[in-house]
């Protein structure tokens, strides 16, 4: 408060440090007239209590004043808080300025980061140039590989075409003969046998379809893995091409072997055809043995019912499996489309970054497509040749075995014919399975050689085609099932007819037994003929094997010479292509470096221009911010100064008003206390006059007593009456205690002095205490009930309160009146005199009988 310019608060703070000083006024210790009998000290105590109550009331007033002061101090504290808020705002503005500086530093760091980015871009461009060089080198290497492979494949194509023509001719001959054999067999066999063959065919088809489904699932899983491995497989293509060349050479050798085997097979087929003609003649004789099959027909009827139930179950399973295949196809197509979309996005990015390499990539892709098409055609031709050869070989082997068994076991001709039919069907199945396996292998080779996009599209198309074929096959199987159901009905009618024929067969059994005897003789002759034919056939095979081994050796030597010549040509062409492509790559690199240098120079110029513009804008913004900040600081300071001045003026006015009010109240209270003090002083003076009169009376009475008690003249007693009060009291005490040593201590004690002193001297001593050294106007001392003595010192400007003194443990001395002194002296001088006591017991001689103020 004093720092803010409130000098008037000093006096008021001093008032706060003096509790109870506002109403401590000076009073005399003279008792009023009404309480003269109880003593002056009791009255003084009552007045002191009143003063204490007045002090308490004054304290409450001072507390109210203190509360008001606290409120004013709170107002001042609020002003100080406003000052602090203003300082905080200034600090915030400084913080904002620092933040702007940090932003500027951040912009500078961004500019430095842009420079580093430019440097990184230059490095990346250099890296791309190096990658372009590597790609062009790889391109040249692949072109050389493809050229060599194309030449080799063309030569192989020519050879394969020749082989295909020969194989087609052989196929036509074999098919014609097979058709003739099948027609003969179909004519011989009954409808029941046809039903069995169809049943086996349907079972085999179902098994094949199950195998195809499993293979499709495996191929789908493999394709997913292959899509992920395409990038790695592209790098390994050049290694695979070399391996495939070796495989092609191996296939050529196999084709030559097949041609030799084909000639051998043709010779053997001619011989077997002759044998089949003979066997057919024998089979015609055995047509009458059909009655043995009647018992088997009953069993077939039972099997037919079980087959129907199983067929229904299989059809249901096939439908569910077909639905699962469709779902798998949809999922595979969705995944393929997603991967295709991702690959397309990657390709667009790469195309945007490498526009210069698009032309070269397109050329390479076209060449690769052409090579792949050529390769596919070769593989398809080879697969067809393999399939046809395997079919013919298997069929011929099984037929030869069947014929040998027929010739060896003529007794059970019918059962052996059934077994031969089953073996032929199994051979057909195995040949078809081999075909499918070879086709799957060829398709996998084709898929591996194609690019990412072509593989995905080809897989999708193949899956669609396979599903369509499966659907068609399922429809055809359903039609076949309907036909089989119709045939079953027909067979039932036939069975009824056969019941009638059984009776006829029983009659014909006798005739057949006779014919069997004749057939046995014919079989013995046939066995001898077959043994001779086997020997001749073995000799032919050994001779043909020797010729084939010689021919294979010659072919291997020729192939080795051709391969060495092809390698020499390939190396020469490779060196030429590498040199030409190196020149092209160097030219392209020079052009790209010039373009990139120009682009970098342009980017640097633009970045410099942008830096200059941004620096100018930043400097202008900083100037504007500083001007705004200075204007805000000036406005805030002016507002703050005005508020401080207004608050100071208000506080000073309030303090002045309060001080004037307190001074007026204090003056009025002082005047009232002065009036009371004057009245009390007058009363005390009257009491003093009365006490003086009493003392005079007492002195007269004492003189009379001394006259009676001693022989001393009355004049000396009157003179020494005031002086000998203490000596008489000392004598009385010495007589009671019985010692002279205590007399000296009693004369020096303060109690004796108190006895000698009068009431006027006591009042003078009370009005002049020796506690304070500096007294400006007046000091008063009043005794309260608690024994505390509050003192008030009045100065010119301030009033201070002293802490009350603690009550002493000593007993207050009693004032010695003349009667008490006389009693003590009488007891001391005449301790054992009874006559003197009798004098005071009489009413005429007692001087205090009529005195109401005398002490007992």
Curated annotation (Swiss-Prot):
Principal subcellular localisation of the protein: nucleus
Composition skew (Basic and acidic residues), residue ranges: 731-743
Polar residues composition-biased segments: 719-729
Keyword Ribosomal protein: no
Coiled coil: 78-193, 332-598, 635-705
Protein keywords: Cell cycle, Cell division, Coiled coil, Meiosis, Nucleus
Signal peptide: none
GO biological process terms, semicolon-separated: cell division; homologous chromosome pairing at meiosis; reciprocal meiotic recombination
Highest taxon in the source lineage: Eukaryota
Subcellular locations according to the entry: Nucleus
Gene Ontology terms: cellular component: nucleus; synaptonemal complex
Region (Disordered): 711-743, 826-856
Role summary: Required for chromosome synapsis and normal fidelity of crossing over.
Protein name: Synaptonemal complex protein 2
Organism expressing this protein natively: Arabidopsis thaliana
